[in-house]
C-alpha cells in the first residue's frame, strides 16, 4: 500500500514540476550582454546590437508562459562605419529564463538573419569597435 501511495505522489509531483528548468514570463527589461551582442530593453521598446548592426523593436518585449518572445521592429545592417540605411522591417524572436536570453533578428524583406546570440541579464555587452550607440528614439506613432 505504501508503494502505491509513494508512486502516486511521485507521479503527481513530476506532472506539476517544471522538468525543463525555470521559465520566465512577462515584460523583459534591463541590459542584456554577450560577446559582440547586446540588448537594452525598456517598457516600450528594446534596442539591439549584433556586431556592427543595430535596430529597435516597435513594442516592449514580453515573454509568454514558455519564456518565448516575438516582436516587430526595424533593423539596420549597414550601420558601420557610417549609417547608410535603410532600416529594414524585422522580427526580434527568442526565449529567456530571466537570466539567459537567446535572440535572433530576422529581416522580413530580405534573406538576412542575425543570430542566434546568447545574452546574459545584467551583463555589459562586449561590443568591440561598435559599442551600443543610442537609446531608442521616441516613437511618433507614424511609420
Regions found by a protein language model. Give the residues of each.
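Beta-strand secondary-structure signal
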Residues: 31, 47, 70-72, 93, ...
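N-terminal glycine/threonine-rich, aromatic-flanked beta-hairpin/loop signature
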Residues: 35-77
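Tryptophan-anchored aromatic micro-motifs
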Residues: 21-38, 71, 126, 131-140
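Residues that act as N-cap/strand-start positions at coil-to-secondary-structure junctions
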Residues: 26, 33, 42, 55, ...
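Sec-dependent N-terminal signal peptides
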Residues: 4-12
Amino acid at each position: 500500500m505504501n508503494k502505491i501511495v509513494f508512486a502516486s505522489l511521485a507521479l503527481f509531483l513530476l506532472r506539476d514540476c517544471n522538468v525543463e528548468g525555470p521559465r520566465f514570463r512577462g515584460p523583459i527589461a534591463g541590459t542584456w550582454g554577450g560577446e559582440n551582442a547586446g540588448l537594452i530593453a525598456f517598457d516600450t521598446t528594446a534596442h539591439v546590437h549584433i556586431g556592427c548592426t543595430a535596430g529597435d523593436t516597435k513594442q516592449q518585449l514580453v515573454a509568454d508562459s514558455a519564456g518565448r518572445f516575438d516582436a516587430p521592429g526595424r533593423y539596420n545592417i549597414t550601420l558601420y562605419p557610417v549609417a547608410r540605411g535603410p532600416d529594414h522591417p524585422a522580427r526580434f524572436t527568442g526565449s529567456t529564463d530571466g537570466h539567459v536570453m537567446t535572440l535572433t533578428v530576422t529581416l522580413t524583406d530580405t534573406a538576412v538573419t542575425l543570430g542566434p546570440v546568447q545574452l546574459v541579464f545584467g551583463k555589459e555587452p562586449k561590443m568591440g569597435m561598435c559599442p551600443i550607440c543610442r537609446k531608442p528614439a521616441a516613437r511618433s506613432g507614424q511609420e
